Amino acid sequence: MEEGRLHRVMLSCGYSFTYARNLPEKAILYSQNCQQGYYTKEYTTVAGDVKIALIIRADPFIELPIAYILELPEQFKDRLMPHISLEGFLCYVEQMEADWDSNNLEDTYREVDAQIQRTLVNSVSAAMEGSNDKKELEGEFTAYWRPSESLFVLSNANRSTRLKTFISQSVRPNGSSQVEYITVEESSPENSGKVISAWLKLRYLPKNSLKEYHISTHYISVNPSRVAGMKWPPASFRDLLSWLGKADHNAKNKVVEYIKKEGKKRYVFLFDVLKQDTFGIYVEFDLKSIDLKRYKHSAKNSTAKLSTVLGGKSVCSMYQRLGVVRADIETLLSRNTRREGSAKLSEKRIALVGCGTIGGYLAELLLRNGAGCGKGHLHLYDDDLYKPSNFGRHTLSAHDFGRYKSLSLARKLKDSVHLPTQIIGFEKQFSIRADLMQKYDIIIDATGRPPVSKRMASIVRTIALEKRPKIIHAFNDGNGRASKVFIDDGRSCYGCMVSNPEKYRNGIDSRFCHIDISREKNKNCGSTYTPYDAAVSNITASLTQMAVLSTLDPELKWTYSEHMLEGGRSLKSQFLPRQPNCPICNEYE
């Protein structure tokens, strides 16, 4: 029934059903399978007709069809066209981001038909006239580059940085060759054996896979006059120089000048195309076929001559297109960037006190927001050992049984990233002293112990306000029934929170007063715990992450937040007022 409905819709849009055996034999959809077929249609453009085949997905209601180009005007063969891959697939919509009425098949496929027409018109216009070609290709230019290998940039590369590249070459278990290029800034912390070794380890590359030499690497900005409609991707170094000559002759001259000046055998060039992305190449020259020293001190007009010579088959012995992947610290943290005007977590001195369930989850969240990855540092405090009984509620593995949680967690964080970090674990309790506390910008109390929280709230008030760190108390309440986070920025304290007569009775949240909290705990000599799953601790860690990040904004929006899993409704985030009966605040008035 649905197939018949879809068939009628496609016919109404001007499509006809074509068996795969009747398609052009060069098309990747061609097949002798007598049962297989596709809906095809010719779309009109100023350059001629474009024939499209639609590949209908398993569920046409929630999956849009794939558009494949069967026939394209001859003038566009091997040319770069926006939204058309080299294999011939047309990207007419970003399906994962799109929204449509999945219950209205007719309107959905009519819109697909119209969108394909619009996309083809824009693509042809860009290829023929350069009309909005940079905009049409934005974000997808390098998708048509077709690299043979990957190059990972571990430093923040730009035109002003001096770069060098290492090559890792090894053999996969199936016998195929595995090559990876690794680029770093010469004067950066990433240019060290420790960082490179960490990268190889994380990438499961053998230590001995690294070649002994490094390659001269240059970062070149390209401001192309146009990008669409040109032959792409360049199949040789000669073709690349030809493309640069048409797109941006200054960039081409820089490439030749670097080779002329240095006279080396091997080069890596990274091309940063304006408003597009970065792609790279590796070239190797046969120095027996060309004496580069002859050109080093020659006249400026020799650049054009050298350009012609370098493109020769006997001179350029190797040419590889490289896919450039940025893996520097800014890229790693780019999706967690705060609003403009906010401080960076990587610059903050942070102490995480308590590396149990909450602290374990929180530490990983903090790292991914930059903690310990810049000028600041992340210190982890806990004197507790990690036991098998902790496994169900912790991020650590069986490898860490019998080891200090703080040390194991610090090692896990450092091993999860290839770049240098300032993360240190201390196998001891945090000493609640004013001189130690003021060495930090943010202190996170994840102990879940009221005596620790009250003592921190008291001692921090002996520090002058301008030198005082922000204290963030994170804890599960009601034996796992609630997640709570409180930011002590000086206006109220932990004591104020538990002294509020409207919400607390004898230090216990009034919503949990009817529960026999003590009875639910498992108590042994030297060990007390409450059995509940890790979900509440995950939530508390996430709330604490929000609290930490909110302290980076110019102004705090709240100091208290909670999430109730059972026992009542969650209160909205708010500023907790100072309580006149708070013993801590009253002591320091």
Swiss-Prot record:
Keywords: Antiviral defense, Isopeptide bond, Thioester bond, Transferase. Induction: Part of a CBASS operon consisting of capV-dncV-cap2-cap3. Its EC number is 2.3.2.-. It holds the Pfam family Prok-E2_B. Conjugated to DncV via 5 different Lys residues and 3 Cys residues. The keyword Transferase applies. One of its GO terms (molecular function) is transferase activity. CD-NTase priming component of a CBASS antiviral system. CBASS (cyclic oligonucleotide-based antiphage signaling system) provides immunity against bacteriophages. The CD-NTase protein (DncV) synthesizes cyclic nucleotides in response to infection; these serve as specific second messenger signals. The signals activate a diverse range of effectors, leading to bacterial cell death and thus abortive phage infection. A type II-A(GA) CBASS system. Has an N-terminal E2-like domain, a linker and a C-terminal adenylation plus E1-like domain, dimerizes via the E1-like domain. In the C-terminal section; belongs to the HesA/MoeB/ThiF family. This is ATP-dependent ubiquitin transferase-like protein Cap2. It comes from Escherichia coli (strain TW11681). The gene is cap2.
